[in-house]
Amino acid sequence: MTGNDWLKYSNQGATRNDPLDPALIGAMSFLGDMGITMDVISGGQEAAGEGGARTGSVRHDHGGAGDVDFYKDGRKLDWNNPADMPILVQIIQTAKANGVTGIGAGDDYMGAGRFHVGFGNPGVWGAGGKGANAPAWLVAAYNGAPAGKVPSPGNATPWQPQGQQNALAGPFGVQGQSAQNTLAQQPQFQWTDMRSDPAMFMNRRNSLAMG
């Protein structure tokens, strides 16, 4: 991509309908070399007291931040797609190296694939704009973890083979049934025919009754 072909604005109908600060555009210009398009959904706004429409964070004042989607070959990148994670990690880390200080993301923040990128106090965040809600993968990427060491998105319990699930089933699951079968194989729990050994039959019957 040449010039600013990598940059697209789709914020004409948004409250924050101003362009990004040239400094932020410069910090994100590496996207052209990666073949990535950045689509600005929410851009800059006037600062408080300047008379223009504005909403939310002061980070967006004068184009100091944008809420954006990233596209590769016409497809929106999404952290829920494992194949996209190395690209997104590279974007986050290169942006930070170029001076971008604030990055927000999360399925429960602005939806899958949408990022806040900009200047302001350094940090990452997720739902509600809170650092405590920043996804683990975003924290790791922001702090420089290699793509292969960044945790997978989501909080789903890792899949376990059926045998391991059974091993954790507890005394009332398959594990308990197995234990019962083991006990049943022990001699003291085997049924003795009264006619073949009357004394043994009575002893075992009494033992089980008192157990």
Label every model-predicted segment:
Residues Y9, D39-V40, Q45-A48, G52, ...:
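Compositionally biased, low-complexity repeat tracts
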Residues M1-L7, Q12, G26-S29, D33, ...:
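G/A/S/T/P/Q/N-biased, glycine-rich low-complexity segments that form flexible N-terminal tails, linkers
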Residues T2, K8, H62-D69:
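Glycine-rich, often proline-containing surface loops adjacent to acidic residues and nearby aromatics
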Residues A14-N17, G56-H62, F70-P161:
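Catalytic cores and adjacent binding grooves of peptidoglycan-active enzymes
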Residues N17-S57, T101-G106:
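Extended, low-complexity, intrinsically disordered C-terminal regulatory tails
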Residues M38, G66, F115:
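A broad, low-specificity signal marking well-ordered, structured residues that form hydrophobic/aromatic
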Residues G43, A65, A95-V100, S178-A179:
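Small-side-chain structural scaffolding
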Residues N11, G35-I41, P86-I92:
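N-terminal start-of-chain detector that recognizes signal peptides
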